[in-house]
Amino acid sequence: MADSSGRVGKSGGSGAGKGAVSAEQVIAGFNRLRQEQRGLASKAAELEMELNEHSLVIDTLKEVDETRKCYRMVGGVLVERTVKEVLPALEGNKEQIQKIIETLSQQLQAKGKELNEFREKHNIRLMGEDEKPAAKENSEGAGAKASSAGVLVS
């Protein structure tokens, strides 16, 4: 893998390069993944609200005369149209928003799995998280010793 400077991560030939990831790097990677997940969730919530607004407008416009004037914002400009012209465009937009929300949901699930795998790989525990289940699983032999070497993230 290449880091942000474009260099491939390898040690100076000592063979200890694989386990040389510092706790700060692990925390930075974990926080980056969490931020990406929050961004996806935020965008999905924003689109859900927009979808609800579209549904509300569509339901309202279905009840009025098709020749009635209505106004629509197009590229920052308010344009006068008729209900007959606007309704199909709104329904098309609503379908596109639904597709985008589905895609974001899939990406959010994938990011959640990636985050959990990262946590397990680097033994990351969040502050306030219950440590009793982890102690039960690792109570055999050297497993208890390995669990104390994890990274604690606030």
UniProtKB/Swiss-Prot annotation:
Keyword Cytoplasm: yes
Region (Disordered): 1-20, 126-154
Entry coiled-coil feature ranges: none
Segments of skewed composition (Low complexity): 140-154
InterPro entries assigned to the protein according to its UniProt record, in alphabetical order: PFD2, PFD_beta-like, Prefoldin
Composition bias, Basic and acidic residues: 126-139
Keywords: Chaperone, Cytoplasm, Mitochondrion, Nucleus
Entry's family note: Belongs to the prefoldin subunit beta family.
The protein's assembly and partners: Heterohexamer of two PFD-alpha type and four PFD-beta type subunits. Component of the PAQosome complex which is responsible for the biogenesis of several protein complexes and which consists of R2TP complex members RUVBL1, RUVBL2, RPAP3 and PIH1D1, URI complex members PFDN2, PFDN6, PDRG1, UXT and URI1 as well as ASDURF, POLR2E and DNAAF10/WDR92. Interacts with URI1; the interaction is phosphorylation-dependent and occurs in a growth-dependent manner.
PANTHER family per the UniProt record, alphabetical: PREFOLDIN SUBUNIT 2
Function comment: Binds specifically to cytosolic chaperonin (c-CPN) and transfers target proteins to it. Binds to nascent polypeptide chain and promotes folding in an environment in which there are many competing pathways for nonnative proteins.
UniProt name for this protein: Prefoldin subunit 2
Organism lineage string: Eukaryota, Metazoa, Chordata, Craniata, Vertebrata
Gene: Pfdn2
